[in-house]
Amino acid sequence: MDPAKATPMFAQYLQIKEQYPDCILFYRLGDFYETFMDDAELVARELELVLTGRDAGKDMGRVPMAGIPYHAAEAYIARLIEKGYKVAICDQLEDPKKAKGLVKRDVTRVVTPGTLVEPRLLPEKANNFLAAIAWSRTGFGLAVVDLSTGEFAAAQMNGADSLRLLLEEIGRLEPREVILEPGLAAEPSVTGPLKASGIAVSVFEGRHFNHANAYRKLTEHFGTANLSGFGCEDLELATSAAGAALAYLEEMHKASLGHVSGLAVYYPGDYMVLDPATRRNLELTRSLRDGGRRGTLLWVMDRTVTAMGARLLKSWLERPLLDLRQIHARHEAVGELVHRPVLRADLRALLQEVHDLERLAGRVAVGSANARDLVALKQSLVALPSIRVALEDVRAERLVELRDQLDMLDDVRDLIEHAIADEPPVALTEGGILKDGFHPEVDELRRIARDGKAWIAQVEARERERTGIKSLKIGYNKVFGYYLAVTKPNLPLVPPDYIRKQTLANEERFITPELKELEEKVLHAAERVMDLEYELFVEIRQRVAAEVTRIQRSARAVAELDALASFAEVASLYGYCRPLVDGSTVLELKGSRHPVLERVMEEGAFVPNDLLVDTGENRVLLITGPNMGGKSTVMRQAALAVILAQAGSFVPAESAHIGLVDRVFTRVGASDDLATGRSTFMVEMTEVANILHSATERSLVVLDEVGRGTATFDGLSIAWAITEHIHQAIGCRTLFATHYHELCELEGILPGVKNYSVAVMEKGEDIIFLRKLVRGGADRSYGIQVGRLAGLPASVVERAREILATLEEQEGERKSRREAAAQRLRRQPAVQLTFFEPKKDPVVEELLGLNVMALTPIEALNTLYQLQAKAKENR
């Protein structure tokens, strides 16, 4: 559209909209935010609003229009953000009453999923991260920032595994929005997983990712000469991502970012790695059933009483520690709180008085805090001295450090207490924000506005008496303010100093100089007091904002105290033990329980288990037994015990010795990946391949029914080969549940492989699951009995028994032939030796040189025929 042909107002709209083509523009017009043209049609559709129209100017006709009341905008914006849109807020920059000509307007903020600060738009117990990704041929840089709390962190991933590491971090952090430079935004390997996870992807100009520009942006923001103090001086990609994230926030929020006061550089290798499959399979924070919290590890462990503590505890569970000193420090703190129940109860009661200090500080810093936010901040600060007193005699080193980090912030608390009303209104333009006695001019203007009605009543009474007009009344309208109303019969009594302003059918309206002077005082006072209160409030907010760094320091201490107290509360309630975590490669649990299942089962119904796995004689535990017998539960509870211990928590067991684990891998269950066209088996093999490529000797691998997604012998072969590879090439602690009883033969072949099973008691045709892990493999799977328990029709169960009997008879014959062949092989020493130490056989050499994963099924079959022919020739 041509702005030259538009009305002045609409020309202004078009000019501003042109600068924000990817946003819905909310254009302030009086008491409404209006949208026009395509934006209006979109908003009307998405928010179910009535679509109207407005004249846009000569030759332009009426354009679609849809509006929302400005005081209710937050709720509407939230709905649009949830649907993946960005909203640009265009406000009036001057009072329309005082404007000469067209009111000045401009965008004061762009609301995107990753730049939210409003409490109603944010998840209370989770961070709202914006992420930025920088890239080069050598790797990736990742920065995340939570504008609502001021948290800012960056990491760099280099080498062949950099993309995998990047996506693992993205999966852990779950940012609401990711910004990419145009080149990276065209890479499906990056954008595909992001969009599949429901993360909003925004393209940001490449110049912001330029290292020199990013470096300058960061040093200017932090007021430093270089970045060596943040540990990223030599991390170009991390620096580029961090600078771009900061530039994006400045461009979107257009406000101070003083609360983003530091940059925490970290290395993914400093923490236990939990890939997306492991987090999903172990249900750390999201239930497999419905994606909710109930039934997750977080659901059990989160007994926090502050939103800050809840967010921190969640991050601890998602990123367990590898530093033994930090782990032991948390255990010591939790231990003291466990053994001092009175201290724990007092501390939790006091923490409950603390509001979300992190986000309150964030809103103060960006200038969006209202008077009620400052009151909540004051109430939180009032609790800090009592928290410090409660911790006066603690002995645990970490508790002492946290106590000493608590800044009482007396000056901030006293300022708010002295200035802000105890129950102020939400809106900052309605008055009533400041306390009486805080500012003399405010007090005087309030007195005038408050007493104005009494003054009017006095004038009315006096004029009735002076004129003798008993029906005389003083009224008010917006056209000419206060007036004296005189009915027609009383007009002869009107004195000469009355000035006629309006004649109506039954009365005439007059004004007097005295009345106009009074009107000026009363109306000006009401308007002036609201303006003055707002100005003073902004000054107070700025004074508080200057102390945001101190508030954040106390907020972090409160959050950690809350998280530690939560761990202690859970440990005390449910009988957890303090684990011994050291540098060994032992994982020994006595009386171990599943933290989630024991909470959803009846009291005392869960069966504890012992487990020992290490990198020596108990390297691989092969666990067999029926479905529903408890194989998966035993393995998962072992993995969860490791995660809890290294997160700093006690664990659900009688005792626990846990050698440090660098990664926990789980391959549990699978389904087709329809989005990428991958079958269940392909998904399973991809996850297993990731484990085999990434696991180290210090990893814990949990495999459940690997190989069941293909033909029996294919699956058995793959499971066997995987077990051998883990045992010989990796040597890590491994728990492998399987239905392939043939794998039990590995105990006699590979040292360190041990057979275990979940005990079952047979009672006639029924079975009772004892859910106890015992030494030795299972000889049966009890599949038919499980089917019967599941409610299969009796005829199906009986037919299954008949088929099973036939198959077992045939398998018995095949087994006899295999055993006879094995006996013949055992009588041929040379052949037996070649099984373990192959000679230089050309067929074997060719086999060893094959890239099996690169062969198609047809190529594999042809190769097999050729090798068989060569083998026959060499006999």
From Swiss-Prot:
Coiled-coil annotated residue ranges, if any: none
One GO MF term: damaged DNA binding
Gene3D superfamilies given in the database record: 1.10.1420.10, DNA repair protein MutS, domain I (3.40.1170.10), MutS, connector domain (3.30.420.110), P-loop containing nucleotide triphosphate hydrolases (3.40.50.300)
Binding annotation for ATP: G625, P626, N627, M628, G629, G630, K631, S632
Family stated for the protein in its record: Belongs to the DNA mismatch repair MutS family.
Function: This protein is involved in the repair of mismatches in DNA. It is possible that it carries out the mismatch recognition step. This protein has a weak ATPase activity.
Protein's name according to its UniProt entry: DNA mismatch repair protein MutS
Source species: Symbiobacterium thermophilum (strain DSM 24528 / JCM 14929 / IAM 14863 / T)
Species classification: Bacteria, Bacillati, Bacillota, Clostridia, Eubacteriales
